[in-house]
Amino acid sequence: MPQVTFNDVAIDFTHEEWGWLSSAQRDLYKDVMVQNYENLVSVAGLSVTKPYVITLLEDGKEPWMMEKKLSKGMIPDWESRWENKELSTKKDNYDEDSPQTVIIEKVVKQSYEFSNSKKNLEYIEKLEGKHGSQVDHFRPAILTSRESPTADSVYKYNIFRSTFHSKSTLSEPQKISAEGNSHKYDILKKNLPKKSVIKNEKVNGGKKLLNSNKSGAAFSQGKSLTLPQTCNREKIYTCSECGKAFGKQSILNRHWRIHTGEKPYECRECGKTFSHGSSLTRHLISHSGEKPYKCIECGKAFSHVSSLTNHQSTHTGEKPYECMNCGKSFSRVSHLIEHLRIHTQEKLYECRICGKAFIHRSSLIHHQKIHTGEKPYECRECGKAFCCSSHLTRHQRIHTMEKQYECNKCLKVFSSLSFLVQHQSIHTEEKPFECQKCRKSFNQLESLNMHLRNHIRLKPYECSICGKAFSHRSSLLQHHRIHTGEKPYECIKCGKTFSCSSNLTVHQRIHTGEKPYKCNECGKAFSKGSNLTAHQRVHNGEKPNSVVSVEKPLDYMNHYTCEKSYRRETV
């Protein structure tokens, strides 16, 4: 059965609500929240990410949250159940809308799941000895019931009223034994399925009172009370797609959107859609430009508290979550879980159009843009559009010539981290990926996969203009520039343009005089790897390949596919 998450039992206060609590109530709140988190960790282990409110409590900071205004359509399901509630104690003269009443109802609702485990009930009993009657703010009454209600039943929880309310007389049948009990509480009920029988016990000199064996609440009426059984609440709504279970139909419906891809919440500013109202609320902050969360180390501000938490790990450098397979460490447990899929090759996200599966959901979203042709990210310099923001960022470095990733071995710089990682394999000469057909080794799995297409002659990428097919998508893009005449790569020294970035890199060595390819036999250096390969044949005793002579000699022979130029023909 799926476990209760910390968010299911978490209690949030605004700054104003936090100010209403006394110091004793605040201490009690901190104890309960920390114990909630420790209980979840003891059961789930690494699968529980430390919430931000726990971090604040451990640092001795106040855990109040900023108020968020939700539109009417975004109000969570539980809030609508609490609206227009009809209290059975309307004759009471205490203030229904007092701050204390609002806080207690809020705490009781959100501590509902917390109070249902035996371990947590024992912890509450310990707190009673420490904090006395204040503990009742954090525990709903739990009464014994013979039958569990259906999940569709709408019911209210017992609300404990503390002594700071004005005293009043409760109407029947809700009189409470006043002997040794300064707390009054109401039983709120609505549309309950069936009646449950409460144990009758003799108390106060033979007078029969209804007594709950869980909460100890006593009543003066000997009638059976209609209450839900909260101790054994089951998650009876199961997702037919992944098997995950939920306690409410509304939560299952919200979860189902993950599989269907339904996104009913649309941003009016940019048209972006979301599957949850909370995600839309979070997104709207990006348009307002508001960044209320500021890093105390460097002063950088963020629009979301989770972004600030992630950023702060860059200052501490703490990476407590280590992969048992490769030893790689991570600052967040979610990153570790995502990384583990690389070892297990688990691919949860499948494209419904072509059936291709991916390890990460972001990879699936990126892939689906190939089918839709969507390219929302446009370069302001040249107008070229991209399907991913990362591709646009990488492209813009062509115009700025920005290269920020430097190799610590040879001090060579690269415009992207992936290029640096690929380059560093030259120094290590490690090639762990071997082709089973020709025994050729590669330093990257992607390179091996690309090489395997040469054996099976797979060419899935076809030019729509001339019909020529290619093994790799990058080769098709490069070929397509022959038809369009596009040459986006320009040399900042002489202004010459090229269709491929590699051709620009080779050309720039003319200006810099760089010759990175050195012969191990004689020490001669070359600007191109192909020139080094041709030179090494001299040492090996090989004869260079001869080229059939043409009738009319040419000063320049330009090949239309690769743009390589030749000053003379080889005889």
From Swiss-Prot:
Compartments in which it is found: Nucleus
Highest rank taxon of the organism: Eukaryota
Zinc finger (C2H2-type): 237-259, 265-287, 293-315, 321-343, 349-371, 377-399, 405-427, 433-455, 461-483, 489-511, 517-539
CDD domains on file: KRAB_A-box (cd07765)
Alphabetical keyword list: DNA-binding, Isopeptide bond, Metal-binding, Nucleus, Repeat, Transcription, Transcription regulation, Ubl conjugation, Zinc, Zinc-finger
Chief localisation class: nucleus
Similarity comment text for this entry: Belongs to the krueppel C2H2-type zinc-finger protein family.
Protein name in the entry: Zinc finger protein 181
Protein source organism: Homo sapiens (Human)
